[in-house]
A protein has these predicted regions:
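Acidic carboxylate-rich catalytic motifs and surrounding loops in phosphoryl-/glycosyl-chemistry enzymes
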Residues: 61-63, 137-148, 220-225
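Short, hinge-like loop/turn segments at secondary-structure boundaries
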Residues: 75-78, 157-159, 178-181
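Short alpha-helical segments and helix-capping/turn motifs at coil-helix boundaries
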Residues: 5-15, 41-48, 146
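Non-catalytic nucleic-acid-binding/docking modules located in mid-to-C-terminal regions
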Residues: 4, 8-18, 53, 185-312
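Acidic, metal-binding active-site segment of PIN/NYN-like and related structure-specific nucleases
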Residues: 149-177
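Noncatalytic, basic helical substrate-engagement surface that gates or grips nucleic-acid strands
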Residues: 17-141
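Conserved NTP-donor binding/palm subdomain of two-metal-ion nucleotidyltransferases/polymerases, i.e.
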Residues: 168-171, 175-176, 182-188, 193-194
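Acidic, metal-coordinating catalytic cores used for nucleic-acid/nucleotide bond scission
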Residues: 64-67, 145, 167-170
Length: 312
């Protein structure tokens, strides 16, 4: 997105989003906060900052992951287990005196520890109890939260989605907020329609380039982004009237598995997803409108009692 203008991607203070409804891809932030060892503290801070600007945050929790992500989840588990084993090995060596706790060892242990961060069921339930007490809405998705977040923004039930997941752009989410700083009350805003205009690219072509470059659904079938873009520019210069990927298949050997490309395309088709999950979306829509409720201070104190919070 290097070629995009400041109209499509720019840093903004949260004041710009005042009085808006923003859906949140919650799992991303639970992992970030868990990495800091302060899930409850940061969820509380996040809600406090949003309420300061009268932003209605709608936290969307993941449900059951799709079968298509099985390979990714297995790989992530192996990576976490490997990192944890290496961390424990280093820790044991230091504790037994076999190794010194020097700066390099400390850095390596800290790096490894971040690689096996896990969000527990307790973290999730604690977060929900804080949200209920603080008077902000949350939704429990039956599947992954991405589809639901994009749907709510595309259909006008929310203004934007807060997520660092690039998949939001593939779902065609019109407005995405990334890189949130709770310290500085700012974030980076992405206008998807303007981005496509700047790139002179359709949503379909954007998705194909992103899919070919690799998503969570085609880990073993990835191409270089720069190579894919280079081929797209060659396609543009040819002025061929066929779709980009059809041209690729006919004139190159770049796409190894056209059927797999088509399969992943369907996974990012929000209209297709809506057809198969109509009841879930209907249930969410019936719970509208999203709004802030009055804070229940007693329940909030109870929810944060084990986290060292002191209320004046």
């Amino acid at each position: 997105m290097e070629n995009c203008t400041s109209k499509s991607i720019y840093k903004s203070g949260l004041k710009q989003f005042a009085n808006r409804t923003i859906v949140i891809d919650t799992s991303i932030y639970l992992y970030k906060f868990s990495e800091k060892g302060a899930v409850a503290e940061n969820i509380y801070l996040m809600i406090s900052v949003f309420r300061q600007y009268n932003i209605v945050p709608v936290f969307v929790f993941d449900g059951k992951p799709p079968i298509e992500k099985k390979a990714l989840l297995i790989r992530r588990k192996i990576e976490k287990d490997t990192a944890e084993a290496k961390y424990n090995e280093l820790k044991s060596a230091v504790e037994s005196g076999e190794s010194d706790m020097d700066t390099a060892t400390m850095v390596e242990m800290d790096k490894l520890k971040k690689q096996f961060i896990r969000v527990t069921e307790s973290d999730i339930e604690k977060s929900k109890s804080i949200m209920r007490a603080y008077g902000v809405p949350y939704i429990e998705s039956k599947g992954e939260s991405d589809h639901l977040c994009a749907f709510l923004v595309k259909h006008g039930f929310a203004w934007a989605c807060l997520s660092d997941d690039m998949d939001m752009f593939l779902y065609g989410c019109p407005r995405v907020i990334r890189h949130l700083s709770l310290l500085h009350h700012e974030a980076v805003f992405y206008d998807t329609v303007q981005i496509l205009y700047d790139l002179d690219m359709s949503q379909e072509v954007f998705n194909d380039i992103a899919i070919l470059s690799g998503t969570d659904y085609n880990l073993n079938d990835q191409k270089s982004l720069s190579d894919t873009v280079r081929l797209y520019m060659k396609f543009r210069e040819s002025r061929n009237k066929k779709p980009f990927c059809e041209w690729l298949i006919e004139t190159t050997n770049y796409i190894d598995n056209p059927d797999n490309l088509q399969r992943v395309r369907r996974l990012f088709d929000l209209n297709l997803f809506l057809e198969t999950h109509r009841e879930e979306f209907k249930e969410v829509v019936n719970s509208m409108p999203f709004q802030l409720r009055e804070m229940d201070l007693d329940r909030l104190k109870e929810a944060l009692a084990d986290d060292g919070f002191i209320f004046g």
